[in-house]
Amino acid sequence: MKKVTIEEIQSDPNFHTHKFGPFLPRNAQILILGSFPSPSSRDNNFYYMDQRNRFYKVLNYVLQENCGNEADDRKKLLRKHRIALYDVVEACIIPDAKDSNIKMPILVDLQELLKNLPHIKQIFVLGLTTTKKLFIKIPSFHNCSKPVEYEKITTFLPSTSSANIRFPTDKLEEKFKTELTKYIS
């Protein structure tokens, strides 16, 4: 995969960058990677802010919590449970919120990101199609000194997007509960 630079794609009218950085609570033990922020998330400067996305509904179920709809409430919940968030794509051309429309992605430097997360026990990648394909292409995932260790601690989960009609909310809740509760202290 040819490495794309921001300079090559920034003149496109559908070019977007990750407006806000990774959410990295101190002592985070879980890293959840999505694809790229939706327009609602970019407008609200935080992850999974589209009201149709089921991420926080599922997380509330798993954690037996009830965080509100405000970014600050959601950050508090994530800090409490040592959950870090970021995305696989840092910049791309995307005309809408559909992952399948991501073009010319600039991928996260996973090795650099994990330097800031020394206590990570597990990485969860949300999305069994586009995000998984993009994650597997991350150069630092393959070129790092310990790629096997990353593979051992990486689990792919279904997307919480409302567009994911293959997984009704109750099935997402059970799948996430099974996987996340192994690592939540």
Model-derived segments and spans:
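C-terminal capping/extension of enzyme domains
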Residues: 1-29, 51, 97-111, 139-185
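Structural motif
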Residues: 29-30, 122
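N-terminal strand-loop-strand
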Residues: 30-31, 38
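Short, solvent-exposed loop/turn segments at secondary-structure junctions
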Residues: 36-40, 53-54, 90-93, 128-132, ...
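Short, surface-exposed acidic-centric catalytic microdomains
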Residues: 40-102
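Short glycine-/acidic-enriched loop or helix-start segments at secondary-structure transitions
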Residues: 41-44, 133-136, 166-167
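Internal catalytic-core helix/loop-beta-alpha segment
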Residues: 80-134
